[in-house]
From Swiss-Prot:
CDD domains: Sigma70_r4. SUPFAM superfamilies: Sigma2 domain of RNA polymerase sigma factors, Sigma3 and sigma4 domains of RNA polymerase sigma factors. Residues 329-348 bind DNA. Residues 63-85 are annotated as: Disordered. GO terms for molecular function: DNA binding; sigma factor activity. It is found in: Cytoplasm. Belongs to the sigma-70 factor family. RpoD/SigA subfamily. It comes from Streptococcus pneumoniae serotype 4 (strain ATCC BAA-334 / TIGR4). Sigma factors are initiation factors that promote the attachment of RNA polymerase to specific initiation sites and are then released. This sigma factor is the primary sigma factor during exponential growth. Residues 214-290 are annotated as: Sigma-70 factor domain-3. Residues 135-205 are annotated as: Sigma-70 factor domain-2. HAMAP family: Sigma70_RpoD_SigA (MF_00963). This is RNA polymerase sigma factor SigA. Keywords: Cytoplasm, DNA-binding, Sigma factor, Transcription, Transcription regulation. The gene is sigA.
Amino acid sequence: MATKQKEVTTFDVQVAEFIRNHKQKGTATDDEINASLVIPFTLDADGIEDLLQRIQDAGISITDNEGNPSARVLSNEEEPELSDEDLIGSTSAKVNDPVRMYLKEIGVVPLLTNEEEKELALAVEAGDIEAKQRLAEANLRLVVSIAKRYVGRGMQFLDLIQEGNMGLMKAVDKFDYSKGFKFSTYATWWIRQAITRAIADQARTIRIPVHMVETINKLVREQRNLLQELGQDPTPEQIAERMDMTPDKVREILKIAQEPVSLETPIGEEDDSHLGDFIEDEVIENPVDYTTRIVLREQLDEILDTLTDREENVLRLRFGLDDGKMRTLEDVGKVFNVTRERIRQIEAKALRKLRQPSRSKPLRDFIED
């Protein structure tokens, strides 16, 4: 187990370093992946598939040496089956008016037959702008179908669709029908890459290192697999066993993966309140305490004003009433150039005066509270 743990850790470190080195460029070639990871760690087919998924989840596009989508990735690409449900309420995304209007608008565009798709692709290669627009519009619902998979990752549904549409336009520009892939399969790759990269770059308010993002994505995948296998949410111990790490490490990753909640999140059925309205500000003083303190200070100043100037100043210095710093009898004696015993006598006399009911009555409410 220890040896296996070490091997897994070494592999994860290398994957994290590979992702870190390719994150800014946003792409990695098949040859680079083979040389750095597949061959050194002798990965089998399942290992390669998992590796490619981790790299793509980090927002890195996998290409051939010419910059086109990797044939290995395209062959494994799961093409969504489109239906009218993609344009109505089957998504867990909150469908508000702008989303509903957009879905209604693209729903009237008919899907293309294989022959129409081929004709349009050839026309696009020939520079036909109208064909380019028609090919893109006919696949807008494909973007919606893919975007639905990424709801809840930190970006609004419409933003996911917008990023996916940008990927769709790249697919239209770069598609080569002679390679033998359907346009929808080719476009799925570009759409998914555009969305996953946008999520990695934009979604989180609190920035998480790239290597941790891909670790979180792997954990989430294993969590979902275990949920399907067990029929219930897996425990950290079960996830840890599957991922060859400690339960404490799993808990740490789950904690990091938590999404921050906006203080502007609406609360209540009418959305007239926000989460921030119910969270106490521990830095700003409570309004009640602030008001009480101000009134107490005013009352205390009025009472001290009934003493002689020397008595008042002695009490202010002794108890730090002005600056919060209490002073010894000796310190106060130096200020007035008298002995500490004389200061003690002045203090005692002043306190006796303050205990008189006529003076102490205004402060009793504060003392009782």
